């Protein structure tokens, strides 16, 4: 009996001395040992991580040493190391792993923080960014180029996110997409002297106003040209015929013969336009088709008399949308995609003008009546310049912008000399100021227009820099 007591006491002491032997292995999960982090991180004491890390290199639980991260789908949250690059440890029901979760001995899985598909530079679509990164690491291991992200979403398709800022606020792009098919590029040709060969001499823009091919543009774009060619947005080209011209208003109507219906632009009410409204100008400056500029309406009623333009009785729309050579004749539209003007004139940076759409409506109505009655369009005299009256305030503004601007306060300021015209042949240049013709003083641009209609020879005195130069220009009679 005494021997049995001694044996039981020995076993009890053995169990107390080694509690880990009290339970057989596998009967339960022991709590994970707490990670003890050093008070200060010393990277020099860190063991170098393996070079082959499929999950990428990440910081350890203490945020000190670099270790190999676990792959997507690997276990995490207990004794396991941290998840790899771009992955997070998530326990059941999608809860991110935390210290509380770990104390409760719950295991999780490494899940990619990004769930949307991406397109790689290897032209493959990956389920998420983490899979692409893993593929890139495998590629580099094989001494191949790394795989980089080309776009969000699957390869070969755009990423449409209706909640993105660019989707909500790109109203200008919406307008351009709507109007661009009805905007045309116009190429102008003339025959060389003593030759039948034609050469391109100028270009401009226009927009379609009827499904059967009527196109509105500026008069100065198409006049004095032997041949007018129109190119649609799809690249198709057509010969165009000039149907009607209003030189004073600088509006022309041309037509192409096209099988089928063409896209058209509708005319808005320029009388309802407000200063500060957003506008879009589209055209073909420098033959660059469908070039878009945007701006606001500076004023809706800039008088022709104030500007010294050819139609002194008409108000113009002033805008800071850029209108360049070749943009002329293209539409100026509001955010509803309605034409509220024809791009016609750039004076200087930030100051451009458009012919109001209400004037276009009047021209189209009168043109219809003229063609219905069979009235012929009379010939006109033409020298090939675009000009504006020079006032003291405008002269001061131009002097501030251009130091070599002539020291003059009135006259007709030449904005543009059209190539291969009497003006160019006579020697006129841009920025010249016409101060007299045939001995008569020139105060406004209208003075020049009046003399051109009456005289067959123009002996001009122009101020160029600070010199007065005598130039002779012989107007040409042309079909408008």
Curated annotation (Swiss-Prot):
InterPro entries: Growth_fac_rcpt_cys_sf, IGFBP-like, Kazal_dom, Kazal_dom_sf, PDZ, PDZ_6, PDZ_sf, Peptidase_S1_PA
Entry GO terms, CC: collagen-containing extracellular matrix; cytosol; extracellular region; plasma membrane
Native source organism of the sequence: Mus musculus (Mouse)
Entry domain remark: The IGFBP N-terminal domain mediates interaction with TSC2 substrate.
Protein name: Serine protease HTRA1
GO MF term (any one): growth factor binding
Location within or outside the cell: Cell membrane; Secreted; Cytoplasm, Cytosol
Residue ranges annotated for the IGFBP N-terminal domain, each copy included: 33-113
GO biological process: one example: negative regulation of transforming growth factor beta receptor signaling pathway
Enzyme class label: hydrolase
């Amino acid at each position: 009996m005494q021997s049995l007591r001694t044996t039981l006491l020995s076993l009890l002491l053995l169990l107390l001395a080694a509690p880990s032997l009290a339970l057989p292995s596998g009967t339960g999960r022991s709590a994970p040992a707490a990670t003890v982090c050093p008070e200060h991180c010393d990277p020099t004491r860190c063991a170098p991580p393996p070079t082959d890390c499929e999950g990428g290199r990440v910081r350890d639980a203490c945020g000190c040493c670099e270790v190999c991260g676990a792959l997507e789908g690997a276990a995490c949250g207990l004794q396991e190391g941290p998840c790899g690059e771009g992955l997070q440890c998530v326990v059941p029901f999608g809860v991110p792993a935390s210290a509380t979760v770990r104390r409760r001995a719950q295991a999780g899985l490494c899940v990619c923080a990004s769930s949307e598909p991406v397109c790689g530079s290897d032209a493959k679509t990956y389920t998420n960014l983490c899979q692409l990164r893993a593929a890139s690491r495998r590629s580099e291991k094989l001494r191949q180029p790394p795989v980089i992200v080309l776009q969000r979403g699957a390869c070969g398709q755009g990423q449409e996110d209706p909640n993105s800022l660019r989707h909500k606020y790109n109203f200008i792009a919406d307008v351009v997409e709507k109007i661009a098919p009805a905007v045309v590029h116009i190429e102008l040709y003339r025959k060389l002297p003593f030759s039948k060969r034609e050469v391109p001499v100028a270009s401009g823009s226009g927009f379609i106003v009827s499904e059967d091919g009527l196109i509105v543009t500026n008069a100065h774009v198409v006049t004095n040209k032997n041949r007018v060619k129109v190119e649609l947005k799809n690249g198709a080209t057509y010969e165009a015929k000039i149907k009607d011209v209003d030189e004073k208003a600088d509006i022309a109507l041309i037509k192409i013969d096209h099988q089928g219906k063409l896209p058209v632009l509708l005319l808005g009410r320029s009388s309802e336009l407000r200063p500060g409204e957003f506008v879009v100008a589209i055209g073909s400056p420098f033959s660059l088709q469908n070039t878009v500029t945007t701006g606001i309406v500076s004023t809706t009623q800039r008088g022709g008399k104030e500007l010294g333009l050819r139609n002194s009785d008409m108000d113009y729309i002033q805008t800071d949308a850029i209108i360049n050579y070749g943009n002329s004749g293209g539409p100026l539209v509001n955010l509803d995609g309605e034409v509220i003007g024809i791009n016609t004139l750039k004076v200087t940076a930030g100051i451009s003008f458009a012919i109001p759409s209400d004037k276009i409506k009047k021209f189209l109505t009168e043109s219809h009546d003229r063609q219905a009655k069979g009235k012929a369009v009379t010939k006109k005299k033409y020298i090939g310049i675009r000009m504006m009256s020079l006032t003291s305030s405008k002269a001061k503004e131009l002097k501030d912008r251009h130091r070599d601007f002539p020291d003059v306060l009135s006259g007709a300021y030449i904005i543009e000399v059209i190539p291969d015209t009497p003006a160019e042949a006579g020697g006129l240049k841009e920025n010249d100021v016409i101060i007299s013709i045939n001995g008569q003083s020139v105060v406004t641009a209208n003075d020049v227009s009046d003399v051109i209609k009456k005289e067959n020879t123009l002996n001009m005195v122009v101020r160029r820099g600070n010199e007065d130069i005598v130039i002779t220009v012989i107007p040409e009679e042309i079909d408008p």
